[in-house]
């Protein structure tokens, strides 16, 4: 048995910070899936022993796919799944063709983890509910549930793990991503550098706006509260951002930007530049 699936990045059309609660910030955001050439391809098959292969930039125990499998095992034990089902996770050979950059605000690691949880549930016919998958996803990473949901567009609230489908004209094939090479943003560092400028009371209003309305009405600073702290913490990013025209927007905590595609013939899809 070999199961192969594709995983696509997300962008944050808007990301507004409400307040800090405990160690983390409460946010509201609109996440949209972007389907173009930038994608990870994951293959899962049965083998004699467990393996996880891919061009990863972290130790195994910090890998989001490995974390997802550990969370899944614990969950299946709690749900009284059979010993053979749980042991079957120890004989999976997982291979990832990694193309979505990490530390870019595109949800690369979360996309892989969310995709794996969703597809394993389908492959093995465990019939876990979306709510159960979300419980696991929130333990792996804040963006993971968006990728579990398989939604094209969704509102994310709380710490980013509460996902609600947003019905709108899909932008999945209308967005173009620019992911600068060799420029990485630490989510932790960017959030630590965030300084609240004004009290934010318009959460519900933002959650009603269509993504297209947001992109055509506001600039990248107005849409993403993490742009300024990201520029403060990363001089290389600041140099790049200063040269970008207003049509480019900032995703997550960076370092990637995105824009509505030029609909003329010959328009590029995905940029990865120096």
From Swiss-Prot:
Listed GO MF terms: 4-(cytidine 5'-diphospho)-2-C-methyl-D-erythritol kinase activity; ATP binding
InterPro entries to which the protein is assigned, alphabetical: GHMP_kinase_C_sf (IPR036554), GHMP_kinase_N_dom (IPR006204), IspE (IPR004424), Ribosomal_Su5_D2-typ_SF (IPR020568), Ribsml_uS5_D2-typ_fold_subgr (IPR014721)
Pathway: Isoprenoid biosynthesis; isopentenyl diphosphate biosynthesis via DXP pathway; isopentenyl diphosphate from 1-deoxy-D-xylulose 5-phosphate: step 3/6
The organism's place on the tree of life at top rank: Bacteria
Alphabetical list of PANTHER family matching this protein: 4-DIPHOSPHOCYTIDYL-2-C-METHYL-D-ERYTHRITOL KINASE, CHLOROPLASTIC
Keywords of this entry: ATP-binding, Isoprene biosynthesis, Kinase, Nucleotide-binding, Transferase
Listed Gene3D superfamilies: 3.30.230.10, GHMP kinase, C-terminal domain
GO biological process, one term: terpenoid biosynthetic process
Catalytic activity: 4-CDP-2-C-methyl-D-erythritol + ATP = 4-CDP-2-C-methyl-D-erythritol 2-phosphate + ADP + H(+)
Organism: Helicobacter pylori (strain J99 / ATCC 700824) (Campylobacter pylori J99)
Active site: 10, 143
Name of the protein: 4-diphosphocytidyl-2-C-methyl-D-erythritol kinase
Function, in words: Catalyzes the phosphorylation of the position 2 hydroxy group of 4-diphosphocytidyl-2C-methyl-D-erythritol.
